[in-house]
Regions:
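ATP/NTP-dependent adenylation/nucleotidyl-transfer catalytic domains that generate, transfer
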Residues: 1-172
Length: 172
């Protein structure tokens, strides 16, 4: 855009893509009466790895209280199980290539979440200590995490509060 002339591409352009998608989904919602369901999980929402009025749009957030590592576990579990009296097909419903693919916001070529975030196993363990166990930074470090990484996650957690306050409600 002319307004961006002379500036380097950054998350501004990425957010336009996410917001355009959100705009289209909300228009479909208005037209059909269906509800847009937010795709954010607890890991992403905790640290603000989301776009206001983009992937955060929606009327309900099914994965709001589910860390990303648990999302993968749930996908594997559902592919292996179909509880009695539950609607839906037998067998795998989440394609393995989706589960195996490195997580990405898909807002620029070859982008991976780990370009911006710690690996989810580390991020989720730190977030569980800070969020669920109400541990201090020193206590989380004592669990075996790198102090610089814990501090980075802590700063991200604090900085994302304004986004979490605008997120759709969800399962708790």
């Amino acid at each position: 855009a002319e307004s961006f002339a002379g500036t380097e591409a950054d998350t501004t352009e990425e957010n336009i893509q996410a917001r355009s998608r959100g705009l289209a989904l909300m228009a479909l919602s208005n037209k059909t009466g269906a509800m847009v369901v937010s795709t954010g999980n607890k890991s992403e929402m905790s640290v603000g790895y989301s776009t206001l009025y983009g992937d955060m749009c929606g009327g309900y957030s099914v994965l709001k209280d589910v860390y990303k590592t648990k999302v993968f576990q749930l996908c594997h579990w559902r592919n292996a199980n179909r509880p009695a009296h539950v609607l839906g097909p037998d067998g795998a419903v989440v394609p393995e290539n989706i589960i195996a693919k490195p997580p990405t916001a898909e807002l620029k070529p070859d982008q991976k979440d780990e370009d911006s975030l710690p690996p989810y196993d580390q991020l989720d363990a730190i977030l569980e200590g800070l969020n669920e166990k109400d541990l201090s930074i020193d206590d989380v470090v004592a669990e075996g995490h790198d102090r610089a990484l814990v501090l980075r996650v802590w700063r991200m957690l604090l900085g994302a509060e304004y986004k979490r306050r605008q997120a759709p409600p969800g399962v708790k």
